Regions:
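Cys/His-rich zinc-coordinating "finger/knuckle" motifs
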Residues: 71, 77-78, 87-90, 135-141, ...
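Short His/Asp/Glu-rich catalytic/ion-coordination signatures at enzyme active sites or charged loops
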Residues: 103-107, 130-133, 137, 272
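Conserved aromatic-histidine-acidic binding/catalytic patches
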Residues: 2, 52, 126, 135, ...
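Iron-sulfur cluster-binding electron-transfer modules in prokaryotic oxidoreductases
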Residues: 19, 26, 33, 145-455
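Ferredoxin-type iron-sulfur electron-transfer modules and their immediate structural context
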Residues: 1-127, 146-160, 169, 183-184
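Short cysteine clusters
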Residues: 64, 70, 80, 128-134, ...
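Immediate flanking context of iron-sulfur cluster ligation sites
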Residues: 51-75, 115-131, 253-261, 372-382, ...
Length: 455
């Protein structure tokens, strides 16, 4: 028939005129006109429509080459927890990078992107746990959290922030006051209004007090002192853990001192409040730089906060701050710890951000524990599903539980003590499995105290 002969190109022209994107019954009856080899659109053509300054600011999004390594589904793979839980490619680093790429092409940072599409981009980025796995596990290091926060900053210039954002943003500066009225704080976070705001399973403040001296105007001898840099989570929700680190500092013949508490700004950064984060980071950096220049050793506890001093702070204040993870400091003094009384075993689960930014973190812990006669099991795990405050948001509840079930659920019960370095990981395990995990510092301090009493 003529329709498949001379008239077919005419049908193709009609199809092209009325359905230029080939969205209606693609491939049925007539397809669009064939493209020439040099007419196939390439990624670079779209990228060149983005102005150079914006391309530089969002370089990690534009670096995605589509290799698809982020589609791994193994529970032992750290990348990407949100994709493994949803199997939705929009919730993978590749999907998010592609969406942000198109948002940039449309002029999103200047408010010129299609509003319906822009909301879809936000939904994809809301699902990101900011675990940083993609920043190292991706072959081209597509760092989704780095451009996620910039998108959120641009989005909230034009859209009101939800109450949960405001509540989480004031958490760090509010905690010193809240700790003075802990029963009132605990009552407040247990009220139904918190779920209405969009938050649940919030931790409670303990009645414990912290008996570690705080630095004042008169500074101790830097050669004898070790400064604990407090973070909001362990300082106020787990003061006993800070005391355990102080015990270990004393065990090696040093004096523990607590740096004056200052907010780190980590929750501000995750929320895309970059201006407020920079101001907070500069204040904290001024204090820590002064202490470092005075010759003090600085040690943090919470991995996500401690690592932020060398990562997010580098961009915010132009320098990485030398705050050590606890195992890094312990590794240098472990030979001074009391000799072990007996051999033992334990299982260690590291915070996903810690394992990503410091792949050797678990190995360093193993060396430290070996000095006190403990062999550490270090099973490969992904994210626990809490990721700071992400799992505390009601909207993320189902995905958070699914992520935990895929990886951590099978590791938190064992015949040996199970230890976890992340505060949010310990919270998540208690919420999802009803299991209370200890920090490795607490297990180590207990072991050392027993040895010291006997000897």
């Amino acid at each position: 028939p003529a329709v498949f002969g001379p008239l077919y190109p005419v049908l193709q022209q009609i199809k092209q005129a009325f359905d230029p994107l080939n969205q209606m019954n693609p491939g049925k009856i007539a397809g669009p006109s064939l493209m020439t080899i040099d007419g196939v659109p390439l990624r670079g053509q779209s990228d060149r429509q983005i102005n150079p300054a914006t391309r530089a600011a969002y370089a990690p999004a534009l670096s995605c080459n589509g290799n698809g390594a982020c589609f791994a589904q193994s529970a032992a793979e750290v990348m990407c927890p949100s994709y493994k839980a949803t199997l939705d490619r929009r919730h993978s680093p590749k999907g998010r990078a592609g969406l942000v790429r198109e948002w940039l092409r449309q002029g999103g940072p200047d408010g010129r992107a299609d509003p319906v599409f822009e909301r879809q981009v936000k939904e994809a980025l809301d699902g990101c746990l900011s675990c940083r796995a993609c920043s190292r596990a991706c072959p081209v290091q597509v760092d989704v959290p780095s451009f996620r926060v910039k998108f959120m900053e641009a989005w909230h210039r034009r859209h009101r922030r939800p109450l949960r954002d405001h509540a989480l943003s004031v958490l760090e500066p509010m905690l010193p006051l809240a700790a003075r009225v802990a029963p009132l704080f605990n009552l407040t976070v247990s009220l139904p209004v918190m779920r209405w705001i969009g938050l649940h399973h919030l931790p409670r403040l303990p009645a414990d007090t912290l008996d570690v001296p705080v630095l004042g105007r008169a500074l101790p001898d830097p050669a004898q002192a070790v400064i604990i840099v407090p973070d909001a989570f362990t300082r106020y929700f787990e003061p006993a853990l800070v005391a355990d680190l102080a015990t270990l500092i004393r065990a090696v013949g040093k004096e523990p001192w607590l740096a004056p508490y200052r907010p780190s700004g980590k929750p501000l950064h995750v929320a895309g409040r970059l201006g407020a984060f920079r101001r907070t980071a500069k204040r904290q950096a001024a204090l820590l730089t002064r202490l470092h220049e005075s010759g003090f050793t600085l040690v943090g506890i919470e991995p996500a906060v401690t690592l932020a001093y060398g990562d997010e702070y580098h961009e915010a204040v132009g320098a990485a701050l030398p705050v050590l993870l606890p195992q890094d400091w312990l590794a240098g003094v472990a030979d001074r710890l009391p000799a072990p009384l007996r051999e033992g075993r334990a299982r260690l689960l590291t915070h996903c951000t810690e394992g990503t930014l410091r792949p050797d973190a678990g190995e360093v812990w193993s060396r430290v524990f070996a000095q006190v006669g403990i062999t550490l099991e270090r099973p490969a795990t992904g994210c626990c599903g809490m990721a700071g405050t992400w799992g505390h948001e009601v909207r993320n509840a189902a995905t958070s539980a699914r992520i935990f079930a895929q990886s951590w659920a099978g590791q938190v019960r064992a015949e040996v003590p199970v230890l976890a370095t992340g505060f949010s990981c310990r919270c998540q395990t208690q919420v999802q499995a009803g299991v209370v995990l200890r920090h490795p510092l607490s297990h180590l301090a207990e072991r050392v105290q027993v040895s010291m009493k006997v000897t």
